[in-house]
């Protein structure tokens, strides 16, 4: 995209709403065949109208988080989790179409880039993150630390007349138990529980590796109140990169540090060396075990003790050599045993004497 085209491109709108006695005063809906969530209706005199929200606007971000690929319930949960104020980045249909033709990705940085002094080409500069003006990426970075501090959340709720107001499900593609949906105005919603959250703990007990029935039983065992430690998708991925299971210590304490590629390679090499050290004697153990088994099987045919007949020059460090010698010895002993079972030779004079008696 050329700089001239970017400079003349329309911009999205940032609407900051403060909740009134009757809420924010707008209705959200999804349209068939279109990705995303749209403003269906804006009530007259409402905080939404005062903030400049318009019917037909497409919702792009909620409090700096992109929601273009999220479900209706997920977007609603994000808005309600903001409590008394919310920041919505929206585009009207005409602006949305023009930005798509120009290949400009809709985000809040476009507005900050335009407001930055001495910035001749705001959209172009916003497109190249980390290049150009040094101040702009710093401003963008400053807007995310709160949102990017990925911590688990402790959701405490008391059972209402209709229960807690959330549904639990498991996903075959990934381990764990997840929140499928949260009912509006339910105890679960009031506690901050969101759709797609993964349950880590129930009432202080870790649920890692537990089955669906185990998690349900743990929740029911809490009676009319339960505490769920949960992580959203991004937080879950962060802790997996750190190789740490989230806990209540991470609610306010220091966060773990993700493994870098070098550290992962070092860790893998250490594990490989440890495994090699453990596995390296195994072939010898297998051979010696099979040798012992052969000795036991052969000993059934050769009762004599083996210690007295084993050659002293044989090295015990070579199980293969021991195995070959034991076979040879076994054959010799078997031959000796068969020979020892034969009847002694009788001379002809004794035979004649025996037959004459009969």
UniProtKB/Swiss-Prot annotation:
Detected in liver, kidney, pancreas, prostate, spleen, small intestine and placenta, in particular in the syncytiotrophoblast. Residues 114-132, 307-319 have a biased composition (Low complexity). SMART domains: PDZ. The keyword Lipoprotein does not apply. Changing residue 153 to Q: In NPHLOP2; the mutant expressed in cultured renal cells increases the generation of cAMP by PTH and inhibits phosphate transport. It comes from the Eukaryota. This is Na(+)/H(+) exchange regulatory cofactor NHE-RF1. It comes from Homo sapiens. The lineage of its organism: Eukaryota, Metazoa, Chordata, Craniata, Vertebrata.
């Amino acid at each position: 995209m050329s700089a001239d085209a970017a400079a003349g491109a329309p911009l999205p709108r940032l609407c900051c709403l403060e909740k009134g006695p009757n809420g924010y005063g707008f209705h959200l809906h999804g349209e068939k065949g279109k990705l995303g969530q749209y403003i269906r209706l804006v009530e007259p005199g409402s905080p939404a109208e005062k903030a400049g929200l318009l019917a037909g606007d497409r919702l792009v971000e909620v409090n700096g988080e992109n929601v273009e690929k999220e479900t209706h319930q997920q977007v609603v949960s994000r808005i309600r989790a903001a409590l008394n104020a919310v920041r919505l980045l929206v585009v009207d249909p005409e602006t949305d179409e023009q930005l798509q033709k120009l290949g400009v990705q809709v985000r809040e940085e476009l507005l900050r880039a335009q407001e930055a002094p001495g910035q001749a080409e705001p959209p172009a500069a916003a497109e190249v993150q980390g290049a150009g003006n040094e101040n702009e990426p710093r401003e963008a970075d400053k807007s995310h630390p709160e949102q990017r501090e990925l911590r688990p959340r402790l959701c405490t709720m008391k059972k209402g007349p209709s229960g807690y107001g959330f549904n639990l499900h498991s996903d075959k593609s990934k381990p764990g138990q997840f929140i499928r949906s949260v009912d509006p105005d339910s105890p679960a919603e009031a506690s901050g529980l969101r759709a797609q959250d993964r349950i880590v703990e129930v009432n202080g007990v870790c649920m890692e590796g537990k089955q669906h029935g185990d998690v349900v039983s743990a929740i029911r065992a809490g009676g009319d109140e339960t505490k769920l430690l949960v992580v959203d998708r991004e937080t879950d991925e962060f802790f997996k990169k750190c190789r740490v299971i989230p806990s209540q210590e991470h609610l306010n304490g220091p966060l773990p540090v993700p493994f870098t590629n070098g550290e992962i390679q070092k860790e893998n090499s250490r594990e490989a060396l440890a495994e090699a050290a453990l596995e390296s004697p195994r072939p010898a153990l297998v051979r010696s075990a099979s040798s012992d088994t052969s000795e036991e099987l052969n000993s059934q045919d050769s009762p004599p003790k083996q210690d007295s007949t084993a050659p002293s020059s044989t090295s015990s460090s070579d199980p293969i050599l021991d195995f070959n010698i034991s076979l040879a010895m076994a054959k010799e002993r078997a031959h000796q045993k068969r020979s020892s079972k034969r009847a002694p030779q009788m001379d002809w004079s004794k035979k004649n004497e025996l037959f004459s008696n009969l």
